[in-house]
Amino acid sequence: MGIRNYRPYTPGTRQKSVSDFSEITHDQPEKSLTSFRHRAKGRNNRGVITSRRRGGGHKRLYREIDFRRNKLSVPGTVLTVEYDPNRNARISLVQYEDGEKRYILHPRNLAVGAVIAAGPDAAIEVGNALPLSKIPLGTGVHNVEITPGRGGQMVRAAGAMAQVVAKEGDMVTLKLPSGEVRLFRKECYATIGQIGNVDVNNISIGKAGRNRWKGRRPKVRGSVMNPVDHPHGGGEGRAPIGRSGPVTPWGKPTLGYKTRKKKKLSNALIVRRRRKSSKRGRGGRQS
C-alpha cells in the first residue's frame, strides 16, 4: 500500500492524503457474501445514545468475514483483494476446492492466486490458520481466538500482528500489538502473518467532511457546554472546570483514572499489562 498526497488546490486538500489502493484487484464485492444492515448510530434498543459522536455517513453493505477459519484441511485459492468500508483492513475472497467462497482478512504479502489452508497440519505460511500449539515461537500471527471455536476476536486491525513468545502446558503466551503479554489456550486458532494496509495510520484526514463520510460526528469540549450538559460547562468566558480534576459528562474521574474491574476474570491470563497511552494531548483536560 502507498499513500497519495494532494497539492493544496483547496483548503480541504492541503493536508489531505489517501491510500492509493494499489493492492485492490476487484471493485465489486461477492454478492452472496454481502448484506444490508441498519446502522445503530450510537443508539441502543431504546433509542438512547450509548456511544456519542456517531451517526450519518455513507451507506454500506456488510461483508460476511470468516473469522472462524473452520474449513479444515480444504485448500483455498485467493481470488481477489478488495476494499471493505466496514474496517480499515483489506479483505480477500477465497474459493475452496469444494466451490465455497469466503472472505478473510487480507494478510500482508498474500498475493492473488496463492493457496491457503486451515488445520493443525497446515504449513507455516502467510494466510494459513493453525492452533497456537502448532505455531513456532517468534511467529507473527493475527485474528487470534480467545475461546476455541468462537472465531478470531483479537489482532484484527490493519497492520496489526501479535507474536508467539512462549509455550507452557496448555497455555501459549502472545505479545499483543498494544504491548500486553497475555496467555491463550493452545487450542485457539490464529492466522499466520501481519494484517495488510500497514500505512493506514499515516493517512491524514485533511478535513472534517471526510470524518462525516465515515459516520463520525464532531467532538464538543465539555468546557464550552452549559452546566446542564457537562460538569465542565458554564462560567463567564473561558472559565476553569472548577474541580480538582477532569471528569466525564456523568461526573466520573477521567484522563488517567483506572476503570478496569479488580476482579475481572481475564486478569489471571494477563502476564504484563499494556503500555500506558497518554490521553493528555492538546486541550486534553477538556472532555
Curated annotation (Swiss-Prot):
GO biological process, one term: translation
Record field: compositional bias (Polar residues): 12-22
Family matches, as Pfam families: Ribosomal_L2, Ribosomal_L2_C
Composition bias type Basic residues, residue spans: 211-220, 258-287
GO cellular component: large ribosomal subunit
Region (Disordered): 1-30, 211-287
Molecular function (Gene Ontology), one example: transferase activity
Keywords linked to the UniProt accession: Ribonucleoprotein, Ribosomal protein, RNA-binding, rRNA-binding
Membership in a protein family: Belongs to the universal ribosomal protein uL2 family.
Function statement: One of the primary rRNA binding proteins. Required for association of the 30S and 50S subunits to form the 70S ribosome, for tRNA binding and peptide bond formation. It has been suggested to have peptidyltransferase activity; this is somewhat controversial. Makes several contacts with the 16S rRNA in the 70S ribosome.
HAMAP family, sorted: Ribosomal_uL2_B
Alphabetized NCBIfam families for the sequence: rplB_bact
Quaternary organization: Part of the 50S ribosomal subunit. Forms a bridge to the 30S subunit in the 70S ribosome.
Protein name (database record): Large ribosomal subunit protein uL2
Species in which this protein is naturally found: Cyanothece sp. (strain PCC 7425 / ATCC 29141)
